[in-house]
């Protein structure tokens, strides 16, 4: 029986997108996309999510791509401009789960420890969680099984009693290998349907 819900944050509850900031720098959309795909890549950003300092991450990239120094430094100096609004349809589902008083609800997020306080101050609903495990603080990230285990052990969660929600299939598969039932998030509407199918929501 499910008694614990574990949410991912980015792309599920919070809209974070580097395009929002870099569109103010690049006049050409394709040029911007090429920069994000080849310079400030997802793999590079995930190193900071896993605990590398923003300063070190920036310095490594500037050394590798000195011709892009200004635009690389903008990634974290203007990081807050990459934050969009909350995904309010999903927040409403979170609220409904919270108000049912049936579940402990946690967040398991790949997020830099240095930028996460900005999100905490901006999105009030983050205070609704019974606990948040941040990759940058723990120095490891999804899909490492040890990262999931931190949450399970810290909050005395049994895998078979938990439900995990994430937009990244890689992270879903890792959770399922640990025996955690999971929902691959694609939209708030489909999430609500699946939660009803599981009798998690009425």
Where are these regions (language model features)?
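Asp-based, Mg2+/Mn2+-dependent phosphohydrolase catalytic module
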Residues: 1-5, 112-113, 120-202
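N-terminal helical cap/lid subdomain that shapes the substrate entry/recognition surface
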Residues: 2-92, 112-115
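Generic structural signal for small/hydrophobic residues in well-ordered secondary structure
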Residues: 8-11, 51, 97, 107, ...
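Alpha-helical elements of Rossmann-like donor-binding domains used by nucleotide-donor carbohydrate transfer enzymes
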Residues: 20-21, 43, 56, 60, ...
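Substrate-recognition/cap helix-loop segment adjacent to the acidic, metal-dependent catalytic center
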Residues: 26-29, 90-137
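Secondary-structure boundary motif
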Residues: 63, 67, 96-102, 125, ...
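Glycine-/small-residue-rich active-site loops that bind phosphorylated ligands and cofactors
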Residues: 82-85, 104, 139-140
């Amino acid at each position: 029986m499910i008694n614990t819900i574990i949410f991912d944050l980015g792309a599920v509850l919070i809209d974070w997108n580097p395009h929002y900031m870099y569109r103010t720098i690049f006049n050409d959309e394709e040029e911007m996309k090429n920069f994000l795909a080849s310079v400030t890549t997802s793999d590079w950003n995930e190193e900071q999510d896993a605990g590398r300092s923003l300063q070190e991450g920036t310095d490594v990239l500037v050394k590798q791509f000195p011709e892009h120094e200004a635009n690389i430094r903008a990634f974290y100096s203007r990081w807050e401009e990459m934050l969009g609004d909350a995904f309010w349809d999903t927040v409403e589902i979170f609220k409904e789960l919270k108000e049912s008083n049936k579940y402990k609800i946690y967040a398991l997020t790949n997020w830099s420890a240095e930028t996460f306080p900005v999100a905490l101050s901006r999105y009030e609903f983050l205070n609704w969680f019974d606990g948040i495990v941040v990759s940058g603080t723990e120095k490891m990230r999804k899909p490492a099984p040890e990262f999931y285990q931190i949450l399970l052990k810290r909050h005395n969660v049994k895998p078979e009693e938990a439900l995990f929600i994430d937009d990244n299939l890689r992270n879903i598969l890792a959770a399922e290998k640990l025996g955690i039932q999971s929902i691959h998030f694609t939209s708030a509407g489909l999430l609500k349907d699946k939660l009803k199918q599981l009798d998690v929501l009425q």
